[in-house]
Amino acid sequence: LAVYGADKVIVVDNPVLETYRTEPYAQALTAVINEYKPEIMLVGATAIGRDLGPTVSARVQTGLTADCTMLEIGDFPLVAVPGKEDEQKHNQLLMTRPAFGGNTIATIACPDNRPQMATVRPGVMQKIAPIEGAKANVVEFNPELKENNKYVEIEEVVKAVGNVENIMDAKILVSGGRGVGSAENFGMLKELADVLGGMVSCSRAAVENGWLAQDYQVGQTGKTV
């Protein structure tokens, strides 16, 4: 983490956290926030993040913007209201995400509560070039995790093995949408992708028509590539 810009790494190491469960993870992350009081808390918009993020935001009584596709630091409101310029707040986290089924883009801020929380789609942020020789201050933090009636007991973990290609790893994508017309016609795109050494991807319309699985969807409501 240090080589990618982290100055401090907070480690919570507890056997209870070996396998993800909402309650102990929420307790741990809530304790980290209460102890270190960050201005911003980002969580990956993964299956775990979409469960953990809202739970933690409710416990620390702040807002959360889900599935963000862009993050910026700026002023809120974006344009000062005439006569109320002194009410404009600076250095706010501006969180952009698709809304209304991807038909519009909304920019959201959380000016009155901290931390400012967001879940961010994988692939949105580009890693910086590694900083050779960088070191981070590693802090071990051991909050008390109390077992309560929200705990669940894991009986068995079954790992599914899928054969779906990860389009986020592709250097070349051949993408099709509604105009392709059918699942069969995507075979032509697959042939072209094979020639180019790439993969096939698609739009939301193709997924809704059942032509390709959602794993291949790109765009505001799909994967960021």
Briefly describe each language-model feature range.
Residues 1-225:
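N-terminal glycine-rich FAD/FM-binding segment characteristic of electron-transfer flavoproteins
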